Amino acid sequence: MLYTNEYKEQLILKHKQQHWGGGVASKSNVIYAHALGLGVNKILDYGCGAGDFKKAMKSDPWKSKFEISEYDPGIHGKDELPNVHDYVVCVDVLEHIEPECLNDVLAHLALLMRVGGYFLISTVPAFQNLPDGRNAHLIIEPAEWWEKKLSEKFELTTHYIAEGACAYFI
């Protein structure tokens, strides 16, 4: 199970209240370089929020060569389960997954990813809450925990840890 119906309702409400997904646009240079080096064509922004990553990539002639798809269960029109892509981007998403669904989501991501990907994960509480009052980051774990968890499904090629976040190239 990728999410519960109750949580999907929380996501829909939250997306109506607030613009989510802005952080990934600032990572477009890093993602571009990694994806280009892997020779990919199709990129999936999994948990795309408002779609700022796709907008950032399409606004730059060098980056616009990629075919970019978006998936977010909380946004009508972006909530269809995606097909396999060469590369999967997951920025500020995994910490929002319901803990009981995380293993299924990681397995799903592994099936969707043909060549590689980029995951950026916050390790601290969010500044926002869900409409039901819970912190928007449902999983708050240190980088070491995430590295172990991701290593169960992916071959991590590079990672970096900063205060409050960790990033992994696959």
What are these regions (language model features)?
Residues 122-128:
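Short "lid" loop at the C-terminus of a central beta-strand within the Rossmann-like core
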Residues 87-93:
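A short beta-strand submotif of the Rossmann-like class I SAM-dependent methyltransferase core
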